[in-house]
Structure formats: structure tokens, C-alpha cells
């Protein structure tokens, strides 16, 4: 007797009727919808939500039919009007659509799918099968064909195809179901096709175009493997773009195209299959198993767990290295990160894993010698790795190049020289003191020059400094790398220290040339003619810090003597009346002295002792190898990758490189047999061609002596020889574009290691800030935070114009810069000028500008209007940095006179009141001479005699507004005063002090009673002019010097 159901049919129908289980189109809601869980809770969990949805989908006991009748929902019978013909009527070449009113809310599409013979054979039943059934990939083929015929968004799940004509004379039946919209697809074929013919399948499906769908077809079986194999060498996003061939405009996305996460998963699976990686194992266990089985057996030498390391090398590597080391005794060693994922520890911690690599120059490419992955980066780990390299290869290198990592240097020295790097430096220095080569280590250790230059460039001493200083001292270090004797190195470093420590330069009061100026000229002359040997500057930030090594006392004393001698000479160069030294940088001495203690590693002083043929210590080989490894060999991965995947792929690439390298070595050593030379066909040529070839050969006999092989540039295009005929030149012009595309691009040598003939002109040219952007007017910007207040500043053009000219003068005029740096450090505007000149525009600069402007106004509102006459603005901004200082002195000191309180009177702006002259030059120069002249007069307070003297400041700011307006009101019927920049004197002499014109500020009157605008014109050191308008984004060149303008302010800065 069957068991009694927990819920009878009537109760279940009532529950379905009360709940909204249908969508707007009349289809059942998906299983993930909340309504099924609500019905299950209403039935007290007697039937699960999943089972309820299943009952509804299969219409168990016609329950859904009864529910639709009660709810008044028209039933969608997708099988209605299904004919039993071999095909549907084909009046329309595409498909036929029934009326929606006849069959429910959605119309039914009828169309035929034609499968050619090749496509049908790919899914047809196989002959050797016991039961007739389609091949597993038939569902994917049908999905593509249906979308190509009608772009439906449905992701149909197909049931098992029925192949039999015994029931209703239909040989093939297929049926699919869409989980999103509950549509049912049906197809049939009445007659079994012949073996040499294709098949036509009649399909009926609801027209669901325009209904949003979210589901995708599952990617399984052979299609999953096929897509995964395609994705190994292709990005997932690119694969999706290429899979849209069947799509037209406004078509929905095909359901058979997987989304990006699925494609990435398929790529990972295919990569694991390709590498033989099992995902359920951790990387260390996977490497341990591969050490003893598979293609990596014998390649992995040592594995460590805590801290993780893995040393690996192939047998072919060892054989090739043994052959190469006989002719090339130099290797490069370096480390890089960002290739392997960190190994997680049980407590959740992890450490970075570095790849340590030894490479050497090969005949065909860069040859990798030995490698290690390690999460520990100390001397002991590196020494153990190199000791395994020695025991495995059995050959010592004579020269090793590395970067400035003390852990790496100590490991190299302990392995190849059996002493620490400090002892190695001591032995090398003692050999320099002796003429004979005694007690010299067997291996020559050198530092990579590119790492050295980059390390110098990143020193903090160059921060907030003008770029000239960094360029000059970095070129000096480049000079020191070429020193081949101890004495020449000491002379050069002494000159550098003298220049860096001396505050003054030029000539003293007696007319004698200072030592700082003499050494400055000596270094500039060396820079103008110096050229370092060729090297590549592709470097990475992989220096591993370690404690400072204790250097031998003899080396320390040698460097200290250089330092003491330089300090003594620099002390004599600190004269007050001389010009400031533009290269004064005392902060450079400590890092430079520390670097000089390792001078035997980065100069050429030991080159002759070790009989090295290389002029430069360069690790460009290993850096280029790292670049190729990351961008080419590991391009199938998204770096960083698991350690086991990396090792497998790396060993495969190493084996490929070794095969090519051994083939190149064999090709180089094997001689061409004599019978091939004897039987070689002789080329025939005319007399003219023969004579032309003889001329080329004669030239090449001399030219080949000047050529050298570059291991990184292969098949370099040869430039055409001069003197070719017109036809050859035309051919070269036609192929010029092709040759340029085939020629690989060489990375140029670093600028600090090239000669610079115009170095003095280079250092005197006008410099730019870090960005070309200028200060923007506060009215065109948003508010800024000043402390806890959000303030908006309007019409900041007066202040911006002043800051633009002063910052430009700070960059171009070194004497003016030194005055501001040494004597005026309390003024907020001057500090803003310095920050703007060195760092450029930034958000913090606008906050500082707001802080300065806020101090000028007492307004408590959030919007501060800064419109004011620029003369009064300058008096507030440059308080304490005057254009002139007045000194009143009584001939007979009268202590009772009240005028003594004003003995020091400062002026920020000088008003030019002289009128009646023809141009600005005739207004300014006489006024300056008269203003700064000494005057005798009577004191207005006590009646005694007094002397008035005025001294100019670091700058002289002239307000010529009233003078020009008065002049034009007299001579030009009251029009505003206008002039040109050509009429403004470029230099003025005040009390034997030279002042140069640095800029002018123009006032542009507004129309309609609005506020006018100020624009700054900056004059650069070479005489060119620039317009700095804070309503524009960038500065612009200004060449129309004859343009009439209303100048209000002239700014002169002190030159000497």
C-alpha cells in the first residue's frame, strides 16, 4: 500500500494560487526566486522549495494547468501547431511566426536548421556504438546554429535526444528548456538521413527576443577543453571579442559565450594541464613530487620549506656553461621580484619570493646559467646557492658583476674568494699600494654602473634642489667610474668635495681665483669631453638592504685624507665678497664618502690588476634576461604565479634556450667541408657590377675594423653607402619604411655617462618647474581647506602675478636665490615662492596660498575677495623683504629727538613719481639714481642736521602706474598710460650693484564697471619673455614686445 502524501493535491493547488509563481509573461518564476521558499514555509517545511519548483515545472498531476485556469492565465503551449512534415512550410526564407493571440502571450517561431555533411558527421551517431545516440558535443552545435538562425537570448538546457521511429514515425526528437523564461524548444526530423547527406531539423520555439536573460550555457566536455587550450596564449577579453562573429547590431549576447570569470577559470585549468600541475596540492609539495618524477626529475636540486627556497638547474645548462666558461669568464648575478606568489605560512604571514639568476653572454642569446627561488635574502642563503652552483658546474668565473646589495656582494665574495666583501676590498687596496700582483683574490667583483648611477640620483640630498645640482654631481660620479689609478680617483673626488663644500666661487678681493672656481672649471671641462664605454641602463628596484659593512682602516684613512684636504681648501673659499657658489651642496659629502669606501668595486682601478677586458661593470645581460622572462616566457600567466607553475615553465624555457645556444656553438665551431666549397656554384656578374663590388670591398676592409658586435641588436640594417647611383637611392627610399620597422630600437645610453660639450650653457639655460602648469585664479577653482575652514578665494590675480615673477627669478637668478635662502626665511610669501619654484603646482600649494591670503584680510566669511590695487597687495605680501631700506643718522647724536625711532624705514614698493619724460626708460633710471642718492637735510623734529641713506634690497619693485598716467594725461589728452616691454630698461645699477629685469605686471581694465585683471610677463635668463596668466592653464611664449600695454609694476632682482 503506497504511503500517504504529507500534503494533498488540493492544498498544494491552493498554495500555488495564493502565491505569485508566474512572471509577467506567464512563465514560471525560476527556482532561485523567493516565492518557492515562502510556499515551503507556508506548508511548514513539508515540501522543500526545490521540490515545489520541480513539481510546477513538470506540471505534476496537471496542478499548474488548474492554477492557470483559476488565475485566468492563458496557457502557452509551445508544442501547438507542430506539424509532422519533414520540414516546416518555407514560404519565408528565414522563419515563420504565429499570431500571439492564438497561442498565448509570446508568439511561436518556426524555422528549419540545415546541417551540411561535415557538421552533421561531427555530431551524428557513431557506427561502432551499441545504441544510437548523438555525440556529446551536439548540444553546443545546436545552440550555435539556433542563435545564428534566430538570435534568441535563451540558454537552452537540452534533454537527451531520442533517436527512434518506432513510436510516432519521427526519427529524431530534441527538446530544450530555458531556466530564465521557462521557454521550451522542440525540434524533429522525420527521416533518417543518408550517409552522404546532411540533415534538416524543424524547430519551434517561443520568440523571447527583447526579454532580459542572465543565465549562460554550461561549458563542459570537449568544448571546455578546446576553449581552455585557445586561452593559454590568448587573453580572456580578447577571446570574447573574437567570439562575436555571429552577432549583429542590437543582438543579445549569445548564451554559449562564457563570461570573463568562467574564461579565466578555463584558462587556469588548461594551464595546469599544460604544466602537469595538480591544484589540490600546495606549491611546495608539488615541487617535491616533481623533483623525483616527470620531466623535472633531476632538475630540482634542493627544496626548503621554512623559509622557502628552491634551487634548480638542468643538465644541458651545466654542459653549456662548461663550454662557454672556457672563452667567456664573466657572469652577471642579480635578483628580481614580482614573478612568484608569496608562500603562505600557517599563521597567515608570508614573505616575498625573489628569483636569483646567474647569466652570461651567449652566441645566440642571453644564456641562463643557474637559478634559485628564495624567500630568504641574507648572505647565508646566497652563499649556499652559489656553493651548489660551484659543486654542480665545477668551474669558477674570473669576473662577476652585481648590484649594490651587500647581501649579494658578501655571498659572491664568500663563495668565489672565500672572504667577506670588506676583506676583498682590503686585499684589492693593498695590491694598489704595491707594484706586484700579490695576495689578490681570484675573482674580480664589480658593481653595475647603471645601478650605481640610479642610486646616486635617488639620494635625498637632491630633493628640493634645482636640477642642475643633481645633473652636475651625477656626471662627476660617472667620471669617477672611469678612473684607472688610485691617484686619479683621489684627485677627482677631492675636486668634487671642494666644489660641494665651498660657499663662494670666482675671484676674491685681491683678484685671485678661488680653488672652488678652479676645480669647478676642471670638472666642467672633464664633463664636456668625457665618454663612458657603452652599457645599457635597464635596471630594477631589487636592491636588498643590509647593515653597513665595516671597511678596512687603510681604505678609511685613504678616503678620510681626501676629505680633510678638501675641507681645508673649501674653508679658504668662503669669502663674503665673492659670488655664491652655484654648486654648493654640503649635504653631499656624507653619502659620497660612504660610497667612496667601495671605490675598488665601481671604478676601473682594479681592471689592469685582474687583466679584465671589460671597461664597464654592467649587469645589462641579467636585466635584459629578466625583462624577456617576464614579458615573453611568462606571458601565459598573470604574474605573480605559483612557485611550482613558475619552475616548470622556467625550466622548459631554459631547455629551449640551451638547445639554441648549443646549436649556435656547434655552427660556430664546425668548418664547411671542402667538397661543398669546390662544388658551390660560381656567381656571374658584369664588369660594371664587378668594379662596383670591388669599390665596396675596398671600403669595407677599413670599415669593419670600426664595427663591434652588439649582442642585443641582430640583423641591423646597414646604412646605404654614399656615392650610389640614382636607381639605388630610389630603391632605398622605397624600402626605408620597411627597414626602419625591422630595425630593433636600442635603448640609449644614460645621459650622465655621455659627454656634454655645452655643459656650461646647459646649466645656464632657463629651467622649468616639474610641471608646465601655472597657478590658477582662485575664482576658477573650488574652495580649499584652511585648517578646519573651507574657504573660497576670488580674484587672486595680483598675488598670483607677483608669485609667478618671483618664482621664475628664483629659478633663473642664482644670486637672488641665495639671498632669499640665506636671509629671508620668515616671510610666508617668499616660502610659497620657493615651494612653487622647486615642487611646482600641487594641492598643498593652493592650501598654502590660501593661508597667506587669509592673513591679509579680516573677513570672516567663507568667500574672500582678493581684488585690490597691486601696490598695496605687494606691501602686505613682502612685509620684511623690502625693495629699499632707509637709514636716518644725526650728525650730532640727539637722544632727545623723537625722529630716532624711525631710523630704519623699509619700503616694499617704490612709487615712481617723476613725470614729463618721453618713455619708461627716461622715467625709471633718473628716479632710481635720485632715490638712492645720499641726502643731507634738517630734522623736522629737533632742527638738527641729519643724513638720509637708502640701501636696495634683494629685489627692487617699481610701481610706475601714477607716473605713466600723469605723463599721458599731460601729453595724450588724459588717456591711460601705455608702454611696451622694449622700452623697459633690462638692467639698472644701484650703488655698484647690478639688478636685472625679471618681469612686469600689466593691468587689463574691465568693461562695464567690473574688476580688472593683472597679467604677469616673466623675463627668462636668456632674454625671452613668457606670459603667465592665471586664467589660463599653462604659460605661453610672448614675442610681441612692441605691443602697447598698461604696465603697473616692474620687478628687478639682484644679480651680484
Swiss-Prot record:
Superkingdom classification of source: Eukaryota
GO CC entries: nucleus
Keywords from the named record: Nucleus, Transposable element
Residues covered by region (Disordered): 716-749
Comp. bias intervals (Acidic residues): 724-736
Localization of this protein: Nucleus
Function: May be involved in the transposition of NOF-FB and other FB elements.
Name of the featured protein: 120.7 kDa protein in NOF-FB transposable element
Organism: Drosophila melanogaster
Amino acid at each position: 500500500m503506497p504511503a500517504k502524501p504529507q500534503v494533498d493535491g488540493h492544498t498544494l493547488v491552493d498554495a500555488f494560487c495564493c502565491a505569485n509563481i508566474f512572471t509577467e509573461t506567464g512563465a514560471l518564476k525560476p527556482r532561485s526566486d523567493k516565492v518557492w521558499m515562502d510556499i515551503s514555509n507556508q506548508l511548514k517545511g513539508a515540501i522543500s522549495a526545490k521540490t515545489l519548483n520541480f513539481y510546477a515545472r513538470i506540471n505534476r498531476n496537471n496542478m499548474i494547468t488548474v492554477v492557470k485556469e483559476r488565475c485566468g492565465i492563458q496557457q502557452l503551449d509551445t508544442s501547438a501547431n507542430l506539424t509532422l512534415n519533414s520540414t516546416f512550410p518555407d514560404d519565408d526564407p528565414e522563419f515563420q511566426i504565429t499570431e500571439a493571440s492564438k497561442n498565448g502571450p509570446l508568439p511561436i517561431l518556426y524555422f528549419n536548421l540545415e546541417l551540411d555533411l561535415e557538421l552533421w558527421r561531427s555530431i551524428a551517431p557513431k557506427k561502432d556504438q551499441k545504441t544510437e545516440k548523438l555525440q556529446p558535443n551536439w548540444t553546443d552545435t545546436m545552440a550555435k546554429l539556433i542563435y545564428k538562425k534566430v538570435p534568441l537570448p535563451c540558454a537552452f538546457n537540452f534533454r537527451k535526444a531520442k533517436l527512434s521511429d518506432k513510436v510516432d514515425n519521427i526519427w529524431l526528437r530534441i527538446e530544450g528548456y530555458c531556466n530564465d523564461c521557462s521557454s521550451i524548444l522542440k525540434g524533429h526530423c522525420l527521416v533518417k538521413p543518408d550517409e552522404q547527406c546532411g540533415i534538416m531539423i524543424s524547430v519551434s520555439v517561443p520568440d523571447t527576443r527583447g526579454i532580459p536573460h542572465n543565465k549562460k550555457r554550461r561549458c563542459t566536455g570537449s568544448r571546455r577543453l578546446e576553449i581552455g587550450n585557445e586561452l593559454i596564449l590568448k587573453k580572456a577579453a580578447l577571446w570574447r571579442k573574437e567570439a562575436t562573429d555571429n552577432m549583429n547590431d542590437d543582438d543579445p549576447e549569445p548564451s554559449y559565450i562564457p563570461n570573463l570569470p568562467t574564461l579565466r577559470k578555463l584558462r587556469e585549468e588548461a594551464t595546469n594541464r599544460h604544466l602537469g600541475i595538480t591544484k589540490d596540492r600546495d606549491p611546495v609539495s608539488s615541487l617535491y613530487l616533481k623533483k623525483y618524477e616527470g620531466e623535472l626529475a633531476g632538475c630540482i636540486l634542493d627544496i626548503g620549506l621554512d623559509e622557502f627556497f628552491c634551487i634548480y638547474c638542468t643538465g644541458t645548462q651545466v654542459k653549456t656553461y662548461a663550454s662557454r666558461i672556457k672563452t667567456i669568464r664573466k657572469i652577471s648575478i642579480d635578483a628580481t621580484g614580482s614573478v612568484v606568489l608569496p608562500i603562505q605560512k600557517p599563521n597567515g604571514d608570508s614573505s616575498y619570493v625573489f628569483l636569483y639568476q646567474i647569466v652570461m653572454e651567449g652566441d645566440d642569446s642571453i644564456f641562463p646559467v643557474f637559478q634559485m627561488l628564495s624567500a630568504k635574502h641574507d648572505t647565508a642563503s646566497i652563499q649556499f646557492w652559489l656553493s651548489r652552483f660551484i659543486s654542480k658546474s665545477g668551474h669558477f668565473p674570473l669576473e662577476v658583476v652585481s648590484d649594490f646589495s651587500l647581501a649579494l656582494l658578501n655571498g659572491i665574495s664568500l663563495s668565489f674568494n672565500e672572504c667577506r666583501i670588506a676583506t676583498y676590498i682590503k686585499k684589492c687596496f693593498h695590491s694598489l699600494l704595491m707594484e706586484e700582483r700579490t695576495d689578490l683574490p681570484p675573482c674580480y667583483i664589480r658593481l653595475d654602473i647603471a645601478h650605481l648611477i640610479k642610486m646616486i640620483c635617488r639620494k635625498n640630498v637632491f630633493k628640493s634642489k634645482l636640477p642642475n645640482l643633481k645633473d652636475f654631481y651625477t656626471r662627476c660620479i660617472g667620471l669617477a667610474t672611469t678612473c684607472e689609478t688610485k691617484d686619479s680617483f683621489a684627485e677627482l673626488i677631492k675636486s668634487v668635495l671642494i666644489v660641494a663644500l665651498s660657499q663662494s666661487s670666482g675671484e676674491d678681493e685681491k683678484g685671485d681665483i678661488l680653488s672652488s672656481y678652479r676645480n669647478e672649471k676642471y670638472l666642467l671641462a672633464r664633463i664636456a669631453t668625457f665618454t663612458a664605454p657603452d652599457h645599457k641602463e635597464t635596471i630594477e628596484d631589487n636592491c636588498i638592504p643590509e647593515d653597513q659593512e665595516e671597511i678596512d682602516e687603510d681604505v678609511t684613512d685613504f678616503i678620510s685624507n681626501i676629505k680633510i684636504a678638501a675641507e681645508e681648501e673649501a674653508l679658504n673659499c668662503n669669502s663674503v665678497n665673492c659670488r655664491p657658489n652655484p654648486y654648493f651642496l654640503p649635504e653631499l659629502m656624507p653619502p659620497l664618502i660612504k660610497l667612496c669606501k667601495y671605490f675598488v668595486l665601481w671604478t676601473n682601478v682594479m681592471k689592469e690588476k685582474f687583466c679584465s677586458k671589460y671597461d664597464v661593470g654592467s649587469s645589462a645581460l641579467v636585466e635584459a634576461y629578466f625583462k624577456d622572462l617576464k614579458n615573453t616566457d611568462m606571458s601565459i600567466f598573470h604574474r605573480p604565479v605559483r612557485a611550482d607553475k613558475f619552475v616548470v615553465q622556467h625550466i622548459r624555457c631554459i631547455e629551449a634556450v640551451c638547445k639554441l645556444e648549443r646549436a649556435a656553438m656547434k655552427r660556430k665551431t664546425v668548418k664547411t667541408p671542402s667538397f661543398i666549397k669546390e662544388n658551390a656554384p660560381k656567381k656571374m656578374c658584369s664588369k660594371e657590377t664587378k668594379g662596383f663590388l670591388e669599390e665596396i670591398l675596398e671600403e669595407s676592409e677599413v670599415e669593419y675594423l670600426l664595427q663591434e658586435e652588439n649582442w642585443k641588436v641582430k640583423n641591423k640594417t646597414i646604412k646605404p653607402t654614399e656615392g650610389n647611383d640614382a636607381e639605388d637611392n630610389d630603391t632605398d627610399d622605397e624600402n626605408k619604411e620597411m627597414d626602419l620597422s625591422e630595425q630593433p630600437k636600442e635603448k640609449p645610453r644614460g645621459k650622465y655617462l655621455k659627454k656634454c660639450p655645452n655643459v656650461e650653457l646647459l646649466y645656464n639655460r632657463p629651467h622649468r618647474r616639474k610641471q608646465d602648469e601655472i597657478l590658477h585664479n582662485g575664482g576658477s577653482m573650488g574652495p580649499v581647506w584652511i585648517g578646519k575652514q573651507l574657504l573660497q578665494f576670488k580674484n587672486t590675480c595680483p598675488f598670483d602675478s607677483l608669485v609667478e615673477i618671483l618664482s621664475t627669478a628664483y629659478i633663473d637668478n642664482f644670486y637672488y636665490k641665495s639671498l632669499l635662502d640665506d636671509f629671508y626665511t620668515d616671510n610666508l610669501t617668499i616660502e610659497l615662492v620657493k615651494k612653487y619654484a622647486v615642487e611646482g603646482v600641487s594641492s598643498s600649494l593652493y592650501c598654502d596660498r590660501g593661508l597667506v591670503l587669509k592673513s591679509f584680510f579680516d573677513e570672516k566669511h567663507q568667500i574672500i575677495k582678493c581684488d585690490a590695487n597691486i601696490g598695496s597687495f605687494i606691501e602686505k605680501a613682502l612685509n620684511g623683504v623690502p625693495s629699499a631700506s632707509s637709514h636716518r643718522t644725526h650728525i650730532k647724536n640727539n637722544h632727545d629727538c623723537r625722529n630716532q625711532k624711525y631710523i630704519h624705514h623699509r619700503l616694499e614698493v617704490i612709487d615712481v613719481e617723476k613725470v614729463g619724460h618721453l618713455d619708461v626708460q627716461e622715467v625709471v633710471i633718473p628716479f632710481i639714481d635720485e632715490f638712492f642718492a645720499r641726502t643731507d637735510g634738517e630734522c623736522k623734529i629737533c632742527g638738527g642736521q641729519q643724513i638720509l641713506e637708502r640701501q636696495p634690497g634683494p629685489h627692487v619693485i617699481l610701481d610706475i602706474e601714477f607716473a605713466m598716467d600723469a605723463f599721458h594725461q599731460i601729453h595724450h589728452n588724459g588717456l591711460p598710460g601705455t608702454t611696451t616691454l622694449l622700452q623697459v630698461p633690462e638692467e639698472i645699477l644701484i650703488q655698484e650693484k647690478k639688478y636685472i629685469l625679471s618681469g612686469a605686471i600689466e593691468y587689463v581694465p574691465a568693461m562695464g564697471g567690473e574688476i580688472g585683471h593683472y597679467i604677469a610677463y616673466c623675463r627668462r635668463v636668456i632674454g625671452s619673455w613668457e606670459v603667465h596668466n592665471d586664467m589660463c592653464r599653462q604659460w605661453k611664449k610672448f614675442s610681441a614686445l612692441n605691443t602697447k600695454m598698461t604696465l603697473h609694476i616692474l620687478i628687478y632682482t639682484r644679480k651680484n
